[in-house]
A protein has these predicted regions:
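Beta-strand-turn-beta hairpins that frame and shape the catalytic cleft
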Residues: 1-6, 114-124, 139-143, 184-187, ...
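Accessory, non-catalytic peripheral segments of nucleic-acid enzymes
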Residues: 44, 213-321
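Conserved catalytic scaffold of divalent metal-dependent phosphoesterases
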Residues: 83-164, 193
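Active-site regions of enzymes building and remodeling cell-envelope glycoconjugates
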Residues: 105-108, 119-122, 141-144, 158-159, ...
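Metal-dependent catalytic neighborhoods of phosphoester/phosphodiester hydrolases
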Residues: 15-18, 49-67, 84-103, 156-161, ...
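Conserved beta-sheet core of the metallophosphoesterase superfamily
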Residues: 154-219
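Active-site neighborhood of phospho(di)ester-bond hydrolases with catalytic His/Asp-centered motifs
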Residues: 6-8, 45-50, 75-86, 107-112, ...
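N-terminal active-site segment of His-dependent metallophosphoesterases
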Residues: 1-63, 67, 135-141
Length: 321
């Protein structure tokens, strides 16, 4: 019977603040190699939107094409909300043009459509069609592929009435970045195959779903952790060492008194400095500082929010420093 590989929310973004370019490129290339290896166990790969984080740069397009032109099984793609240009439209339209993707295994659906692989029938409901409330008609036995934000209590509300998806026996969704079943419905999010923002939990898993159909109605769903390098944020106390990780990209928040933080040099490993509340015992190290620098340190010490404007105003007094 049919085996389905499902991924979503790759968010290819090579020019991300505080993320080394070559490390990010290498991370995606490692992901591509693992996806190609998983293809050997599957009949079809569904990519449920948000391959890109935003309108891509040329190097990001080339990176995507290096993978997509290498896939060896039928691969179906729908755009997500990050690939939308205006209501109902997506820049993925450009990838449907002749010779944009030179691999006959790949099909991009920017409009509602259907396709079959073996005994599996798919109905595609891209993000732009959802925006226009153009739900495709239900065909018995179809698997729905779409990109819709579900509810994440208490702050994230659903953008669609999920009860309308209930006729489909299985819905493969993109948007939410963590792997889970949506409530008690037949809707499943594979989550992102790699973390797209800095995590504090190094053990959190990211990957893809594999569906193994035992007959035309029953299937087994398996989550596969791709174990890719992660973006990690750690918090340490001033004086602790910021250690470079050989696999993950780790940045550090450093806490301490204002005088302790003033002695910490800015490096690629430093995310930000967090000043502890000032106390009577804390003293500012004002050696080799001019008057403007002293004022800047003092304003930060007493936690003035708009210290830059205060310093700029002070400079207009033209005091000899």
């Amino acid at each position: 019977m049919t085996k389905i590989l499902c991924s979503a929310d790759w968010h290819i973004l090579l020019h991300k603040k505080k993320v080394p370019y070559e490390w990010q490129v290498g991370r995606f290339k490692t992901m591509f190699r693992k996806l190609i290896a998983l293809e050997q166990r599957c009949d079809v790969h569904i990519i449920a939107g948000d391959i890109f984080d935003k309108k891509p740069e040329p190097d990001e397009i080339c990176l995507f094409l290096s993978y997509i032109n290498s896939v060896t099984i039928p691969t179906f793609i729908i755009p997500g909300n990050h690939e939308a240009t205006r209501k109902g439209e997506s820049f993925f339209e450009h990838f449907t043009q002749e010779n944009a993707i030179k691999n006959e295994n790949v099909t991009v659906f920017t409009r509602n459509g259907r396709a079959s692989v073996g005994q599996a029938n798919f109905c595609f409901f891209p993000y732009g069609e959802m925006q226009k409330d153009n739900l495709p008609p239900y065909v018995e036995g179809d698997i729905l592929v779409t990109h819709i934000r579900g509810e994440v209590p208490p702050h994230v509300s659903p953008e669609y009435d999920f009860s309308r998806l209930s006729p489909w026996r299985l819905c493969l969704l993109g948007d939410l970045h963590f792997n889970h079943r949506y409530g008690d419905s037949n809707c499943y999010y594979p989550g992102s195959p790699l973390n797209t923002t800095f995590d504090r939990d190094e053990k959190r898993q990211y990957g893809v779903d594999l569906y193994d159909f035992t007959d035309d109605k029953n299937y087994k769903r398996t989550f596969i952790d791709l174990a890719l390098p992660k973006l990690i944020r750690k918090r340490i106390v001033a004086g602790e060492k910021m250690t470079e990780d050989k696999t993950n990209h780790v940045v550090y928040e450093v806490t301490g008194s204002i005088d302790e933080l003033s002695k910490i040099e800015n490096t690629e490993l430093l995310d930000k400095k967090i000043a502890a509340a000032p106390d009577d015992q804390s003293k500012l190290d004002l050696k080799n500082k001019n008057l403007y620098e002293e004022l800047d340190m003092y304003l930060e010490y007493i936690k003035v929010k708009d210290k830059e404007s205060v310093v700029d105003e002070f400079k207009t007094l033209n005091i000899d420093v």
